[in-house]
A protein has these predicted regions:
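Catalytic nucleophile loop
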Residues: 16, 170-173, 307
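FAD-site-proximal beta/loop scaffold in flavoenzymes
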Residues: 144-161, 244-322, 409, 424
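Glycine/Thr-rich phosphate-binding loops of Rossmann-like dinucleotide-binding domains
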Residues: 18, 124, 137-139, 175, ...
Length: 464
């Protein structure tokens, strides 16, 4: 059968961009269909603009610490921050798709090889679904009459609100809570769990939670929102404890929903699982082998870097025979929370290792015991590594300055099944925060030297 294109990609977020740009570079006939903006949520209303906000907020905090709080000195105007964010978006997407035809329309399946958009039908041998997710609004009394902020609208504010309630305690909630607090907004976080960052390392999450509270962020844990209403003064939220919270704005950051309803997946024979994820196998194929689902829509890992990686793997698998295809589940996924301090993790967590009965050792080095961290006034934090019986590196958690860069070394170690001695004999630049990773290996080794038999062996070889 002759097709109009080799490949049609629906959605141009991180996953769709990877598929479309790489496919075109490989000589394939590619058509990309995007409903809104190139870059998807990450580039336009997610990880990229949020880092611009965080950067501005950190500068304000640094200025306050260096100069002292000067009464009446306002934070930088939000419109200047927004202008910078617009500049980032323009620079990021400019000229990227000169060689890839892009159609800005809503797409849906006619059948398993045919996609319709804007009244036109096009066929392809391979089709990639990369539609991502969108923010979930709370289902509480009065919610339909309240204008919630989400990450999709937060960066369009004309000014920093005087106060804001944030529903949720995950990455988006935490990053925006700290950023807006440092920019002069009074923040109250409402979190159903016993702490924020409930999926992360407990010690690291509690360190960040206390840091937030020290900066003036109010955190209500073990609390559920029951009802909400719009008042003349702004927002009134009633919790399950009966407390009434008042603020100028409210941000919903407590969940995500899938964004493929308009695709008519049933026309293509593409199935979803009980949780709504598009069902994929280890090669990222859906229930139709020539249709792939990449990124958030398959529910595997809701991270932009994971989406990009899946796009690359799926494109390779679409071209290769089965025996050469790659299992996307075998690649570790590091994750970083861009709070201050940053929190990064990769591999097995301490909780999972204990729950599965794995025999392992936890090695910890604290920033406060490292001269460079003290000198740079970033002494809050630690590096924690989980080492198996044979010395294999099973996972790592880093909370502190630069952890988002440091975690990549540990991701390579976990994926390649390296042993802690591999890091011990790897020279690290000094004095950098990354040197703390080598300190972990040194600490592990020094503990071995405490054993009497080891000391005897050392003395024996020294006398030869």
């Amino acid at each position: 059968m002759k097709y109009d294109y080799d490949l049609i990609c629906i959605g141009l977020g991180p996953a769709g961009m990877a598929v479309s740009l790489m496919g075109s570079a490989m000589g394939l006939r590619v058509l990309a269909v995007e409903r809104e903006r190139i870059g998807g949520e990450c580039m336009n209303v997610g990880c990229i603009p949020s880092k611009g906000i965080l950067r501005a907020a950190k500068r304000v905090k640094t200025a306050e610490e260096l100069l002292g709080e000067i009464a009446g000195t306002p934070p930088p105007p939000f419109e200047k921050i927004r202008a910078h964010l617009d500049f980032i978006g323009e620079k990021k997407t400019k000229n990227l798709f000169e060689n890839v035809p892009v159609v800005f329309e809503e797409a849906h399946f006619v059948d398993s090889h045919t996609v319709e958009f804007g009244g036109k039908k096009k066929t392809a041998k391979r089709i990639f679904i990369a539609t991502g997710t969108r923010p979930e609004l709370p289902r509480i009394e009065g919610a339909e009459s309240v204008k919630f902020l989400t990450n999709e609208s937060l960066f369009s504010l004309e000014k920093i609100p005087e106060s804001m309630i944030i529903l949720g305690g995950g990455a988006i909630a935490c990053e925006m809570a700290q950023a807006f607090s440092r920019l002069g907004c009074r923040i109250t976080m409402v979190q159903r769990g016993k702490r924020i960052l409930s999926r992360n390392d407990e010690e690291a999450a509690l360190l960040i939670q206390e840091k937030f509270r020290a900066e003036g962020i109010r955190i209500l844990t073990g609390t559920l929102p029951k009802s909400v209403r719009q008042s003349d003064a702004g927002i009134e939220l009633t919790t399950d404890t009966g407390e009434i919270l008042r603020a100028e704005k409210i941000l919903a950051a407590a969940g995500r929903r899938f964004d493929y309803a308009a695709l008519n997946l049933e026309n293509a024979g593409v199935a979803t699982d009980a949780r709504g994820n598009i069902r994929v196998n280890k090669f990222l194929q859906t229930t139709q082998a020539h249709i792939f689902a990449v990124g958030d829509c398959n529910g595997a890992h809701l991270f932009s870097h994971a989406a990009m990686h899946q796009g690359m793997i799926a494109l390779m698998n679409a071209m290769l025979p089965r025996f050469l295809r790659r299992d996307f589940r075998k690649y570790v996924v590091p994750a970083t929370l861009f709070s201050d301090p940053q929190l990064s993790e990769v591999g097995a967590s301490e909780r999972v290792l204990r729950d599965t009965g794995t025999r392992f050792e936890t090695v910890v080095c604290r920033y406060g015991d490292y001269g460079a961290a003290i000198a740079e006034d970033v002494a809050d934090g630690f590096v924690k590594a989980f080492i198996g019986r044979t010395g294999r590196i099973l996972g790592a958690c880093i909370v502190g300055e630069g952890s988002g860069e440091m975690i990549n070394e540990w991701a390579l170690a976990v994926q390649k099944k390296l042993r802690i001695t591999d890091l011990l004999f790897l020279q690290h630049s000094f004095p950098t925060m990354g040197f703390l990773s080598k300190r972990i290996a040194e600490s592990w080794m020094m503990k071995r030297t405490e054993h009497p038999i080891f000391k005897k062996i050392c003395r024996f070889f020294f006398r030869l």
